[in-house]
């Protein structure tokens, strides 16, 4: 297990997904054991990121996802629509992809419930192109405090696992980063209900037999 506790001196923690045992996903997995909240800033969001953290994200009291409207080639059609529609289309496609995997039926209902309860909130920043990537974690213990992983990894399964990224953990500047996050969060549009509707529609496509067979 990699030490994610406060570092002494100027030791720098880099997470680049190059080490099979230490990827961005593993970093978030370990923080979920000790954190109460997670604030995510990402160019775009795919449901696979939360499914990969299934069993861990549930330990958090609050998750906020602040996303941009970036799209991958498979969702180019969204470019013809509005900014917020792009983000929703991207999520729609990512859900279709995840439905081919066995963890979809067990993972998505929990996410739906978390959005309904307000545990997970999603907003889209549409004032300008939003290209930021950061994971701000707030530990339950004041001794551990807060930390931020800032770099290039989007909150997508490839961004957390396969892509070579460059993410650096910061501890001393977290208050400044949190203020930046709050400012952009307030300027963003709440799309939690839209995300919920998209996910509910996909879950509803399964018959009771398919769910319990």
Language-model features, listed with the residues they occupy:
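PLD/PLD-like phosphodiesterase catalytic module centered on the HKD motif
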Residues: 1-213
């Amino acid at each position: 297990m990699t030490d994610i506790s406060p570092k002494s001196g100027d030791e720098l923690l880099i997470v680049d997904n190059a080490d099979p045992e230490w990827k961005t996903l593993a970093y978030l997995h370990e923080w979920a054991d000790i954190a109460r909240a997670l604030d995510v800033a990402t160019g775009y969001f795919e449901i696979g990121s939360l499914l990969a953290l299934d069993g861990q994200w549930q330990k958090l009291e609050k998750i906020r996802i602040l996303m941009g409207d970036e799209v991958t080639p498979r969702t180019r059609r969204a470019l013809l629509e509005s900014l917020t529609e792009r983000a929703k289309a991207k999520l729609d496609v990512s859900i279709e992809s995840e439905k081919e995997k066995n963890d979809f039926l067990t993972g998505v209902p929990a996410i739906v419930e978390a959005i309904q309860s307000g545990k997970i909130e999603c907003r889209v920043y549409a004032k300008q192109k939003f290209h930021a990537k950061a994971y701000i974690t707030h530990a339950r213990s004041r001794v551990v405090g807060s930390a931020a992983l800032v770099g290039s990894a989007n909150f997508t399964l490839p961004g957390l696992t396969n892509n070579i990224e460059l993410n650096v953990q910061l501890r001393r500047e977290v208050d400044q980063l949190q203020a930046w996050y709050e400012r952009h969060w307030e300027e963003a549009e709440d799309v939690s209900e839209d995300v919920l509707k998209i996910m509910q529609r996909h879950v509803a496509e399964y018959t009771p037999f398919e769910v319990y067979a």
